[in-house]
């Protein structure tokens, strides 16, 4: 983990009339175990992809302010790698929460713009409570050594506390007005010139949640039309002014979505999410 962020996929851009600039890179933040092994299993996403691992994985150090401290540190890593332009942020499980915090930090950055967030089966935590339905995920190599398992377990224990104690950042509200049958989103800036608006976000949700009423695999729902919003949005419907555009199902459960039989479909969903978010920016 010496290289951080580590290059996971390199996109060789060919300039053409339709797309002169290379696609915005995607920075994926580690899972609860602190590693980025799972992201190396993804098929091509059509853009450069970096993985950010937990630098405390090999040490006894902890993060003083949890997710907030992690996000601040990771933002510096991102800026050192990609100082200016448009980027996408994302992550599996805990990584999705850190991505939200990092996007908030970067919201007023004059050089770097977060055009979207891609969360992979992340759950919005209730402060002070541990979510039992979807636990924090991690993925280790199949040849995990006892030492590696112990380090991963340490990160997992910390991640549970960090998730439980996380105070989600505040976002400014946005309003949608319809002009000539075209929906346009405008920022509401009444009495608030400091709080930023949230970048558009896609939540990729594991289809198998352990119940018998799983939805159709190909269903893609704007969150405002979901009849079961809390389940469908994994609690993010409770997050005030959070700009969750779509919830997309992918096969598998929280722990098997990166398995061989599921990762092709997951890769497709992540790629489609990135492409949609960039188009809306």
Swiss-Prot record:
Pfam families: Thioesterase (PF00975). InterPro entries: AB_hydrolase_fold (IPR029058), Thioesterase (IPR001031). It comes from the Eukaryota. GO terms for molecular function: hydrolase activity. Disruption phenotype: Significantly decreases pneumocandin production. Pneumocandin B0 is the starting molecule for the first semisynthetic echinocandin antifungal drug, caspofungin acetate. Pneumocandin B0 is a minor fermentation product, and its industrial production was achieved by a combination of extensive mutation and medium optimization. Inactivation of three of gloP/GLP450-1, gloO/GLP450-2, and gloM/GLOXY1 generates 13 different pneumocandin analogs that lack one, two, three, or four hydroxyl groups on 4R,5R-dihydroxy-ornithine and 3S,4S-dihydroxy-homotyrosine of the parent hexapeptide. Its EC number is 3.1.-.-. Residues 210-232 have a biased composition (Polar residues). GO terms for biological process: biosynthetic process. Pathway: Mycotoxin biosynthesis. Keywords: Hydrolase. Residues 207-233 are annotated as: Disordered. The keyword Hydrolase applies. Belongs to the AMT4 thioesterase family. Probable thioesterase; part of the gene cluster that mediates the biosynthesis of pneumocandins, lipohexapeptides of the echinocandin family that prevent fungal cell wall formation by non-competitive inhibition of beta-1,3-glucan synthase. The 10,12-dimethylmyristoyl side chain is synthesized by the reducing polyketide synthase gloL/GLPKS4. The thioesterase gloN/GLHYD exclusively interacts with gloL/GLPKS4 to maintain turnover of the polyketide side chain. This is Probable thioesterase gloN.
């Amino acid at each position: 983990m010496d290289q951080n962020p580590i290059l996971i996929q390199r996109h060789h851009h060919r300039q053409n009339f339709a797309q002169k600039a290379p696609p915005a890179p995607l920075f994926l933040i580690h899972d609860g175990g602190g590693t980025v092994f799972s992201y190396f299993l993804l098929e091509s996403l059509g853009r450069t992809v970096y993985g950010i691992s937990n630098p405390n994985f090999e040490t006894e150090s902890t993060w003083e302010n949890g997710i907030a401290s992690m996000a601040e540190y990771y933002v510096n890593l991102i800026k050192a790698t990609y100082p200016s332009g448009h980027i996408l942020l994302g992550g599996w499980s805990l990584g999705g929460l850190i991505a939200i915090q990092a996007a908030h930090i970067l919201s007023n950055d004059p050089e770097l713009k977060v055009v979207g967030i891609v969360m992979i089966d992340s759950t919005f935590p209730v402060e002070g409570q541990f979510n039992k339905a979807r636990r924090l995920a991690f993925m280790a190599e199949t040849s995990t050594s006892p030492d590696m398992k112990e380090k991963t377990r340490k990160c997992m224990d910390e991640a549970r506390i960090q998730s439980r104690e996380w105070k989600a950042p505040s976002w400014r509200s946005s309003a949608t007005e319809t002009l000539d049958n075209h929906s346009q989103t405008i920022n509401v800036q009444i009495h608030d010139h400091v709080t930023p608006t949230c970048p558009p976000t896609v939540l990729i949700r594991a289809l198998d949640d352990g119940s018998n009423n799983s939805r159709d695999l190909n269903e893609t729902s704007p969150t405002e039309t979901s009849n079961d919003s809390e389940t469908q949005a994994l609690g993010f419907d409770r997050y005030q002014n959070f700009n969750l555009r779509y919830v997309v199902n992918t096969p598998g459960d929280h722990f098997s979505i990166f398995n061989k039989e599921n990762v092709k479909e997951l890769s497709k969903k992540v790629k489609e999410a990135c492409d949609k978010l960039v188009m809306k920016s």
